[in-house]
Amino acid sequence: MWILIYLFIIWSSLRTWVTAVDSTTTVGDDLNETVSASVWPTMSPQMTVAFRSQRDVMGNLTIDQLPYVGLNLRRVLLNNETSMVNEGNNTRLLTLFKSMLSSEANAFVLDLEQYNNDLRVVDTTLLFSDVLIALESFIFSTQNNLYANIIVLLLNISAPELDSTEYRHQNQTLNTTYILDKNLGNSFIYKPTDLQSDRAKNNTWNIYGKSSIDGWPTLGSVLYEQKKRLVIGELTDFFNETTAPYIFPHDVFHYEQGNSTLDCPSTVEGLTDLSSIHWRFLDSLFNSVDIKEYISCGLSPIISNSAYVNNVTQLADIIHEGSVWSWDSDQPSVTQSTSKSGSSSGTLEAYNCVLLYYFANNETVTWRVGNCYNSNIGLCRYENMAFRWLVRSNKATYFDFDSYQGSKCPDQYSFNIPRSPLEQRSFIAYMRNSSFSDTQIWIDLNSISVSNCWVSGGPYASCPYEKVISRRNFVTMMVPASVCSFALLCIVVYLSVLRVPIYDNRKNWRRVINKISKSELEGVPS
């Protein structure tokens, strides 16, 4: 019985160890997973980590200020030149749409027309409900902290050719709420009523990080607290609050086609003015060069490059250039473990911290992984001011720049990071005005706690995806317990195999007892 008990203890210890080892590599293992269909090029492990780290960095930005990269589905996928559309190949169209959802694109413009008291995708036989079912499938498969992201669906509704009376009647009888509830469900949709509720609870913010009655909630609040994934908006004026309570009206979005009327800001005042405009979209033709410039100017590009179905995946390069505005082309380096090691020169190495490289000749910046033990200057931000920066001249390791003893940043400043293309543009303006040469600067981003999980919050920030026990701490914790368990097991085995001598010689012991018993007096003493 005792053997079984202690074997169970050992088995439990080993099982816990295996679980902990698996948990420390979960993020790395997830790099090999994919939720993409085979039609669209899948993201590499490096690209997956880069895209996820950007999302996490932007967690405290409001959803209206995020940089979205979108596709105009009618131009890119559902145009009349696509043979699948002419053939009515809806299955393949939906397969390609699902694979687009799994790419870096996170905004889509969809043209719909009213058809028999329903909505149908223009120039196809696809119903709006078919698209919603595909969306629901994708959202369910990515409803976790690793893959979840906000999707914006912008609708262009074509009015039927009817007189005004018939038009009003059909508009009122078209039940969009029923269509959305039946084929997608309202739990994933961030609705106008949700925005009203957030504003009533002071859960909406402006660019200064202060509660605002005309602001929007943060990405982290929408994704992780409210578990919302989809924002639906209308670009036309077909619906109203009564007929489509789940859909935001057209005046919420700043949507332009062709050329933008918004100037690209170069001053803090210009950046602040631009940030006061919500949901800035530009629907136009883009290439892999100019899309980065539009992103850095605070616009969310909607790609309208006409494509054939056989070459539609060539747009993946353009989407990639627009969606990754931070990391260098070969970054971040994907590792299998986080460890501290010594080089041949005897110095410590831990390539788990991020340096922002500034190039003065062309005024560009990029992020690269660096050795946390190297000494560099660091980046500080003034309180909650999104566009006010300070670079400290005193060098320190990543661990020393922002530690428990205090930060190297002065009072009212904190160790920080550009969280969006606009903030990065304001940093470039600061570096230009301060006449900095080419410089490497620590920013608040590292993967010290878990490999490939890049987090902000200093060197002691934990990975948000799960509760993880590091290998180093786990070994320190489990070695004493394992040694004690093994020692107890050895004692039990020893006592079970080697009997105590008194039991090993029972006959002699019984003879001695009988001899002593005979010498005892019997009866009652007189």
Swiss-Prot record:
Keywords: Glycoprotein, Membrane, Signal, Transmembrane, Transmembrane helix. The keyword Signal applies. It is found in: Membrane. The chain crosses the membrane at residues 478-498. Coiled coil: none annotated. GO terms for cellular component: membrane. Residues 21-477 are extracellular. Glycans are attached at N32, N60, N80, N89, N156, N171, N175, N202, N240, N259, N311, N362, N433. Residues 499-526 are cytoplasmic. InterPro entries: Telomere_Capping_Maintenance. Pfam families: TIM-barrel_MTC6. It is a single-pass type I membrane protein. Residues 1-20 form the signal peptide. It comes from the Eukaryota. Its main location: membrane. Belongs to the MTC6 family. May be involved in telomere capping. This is Maintenance of telomere capping protein 6.
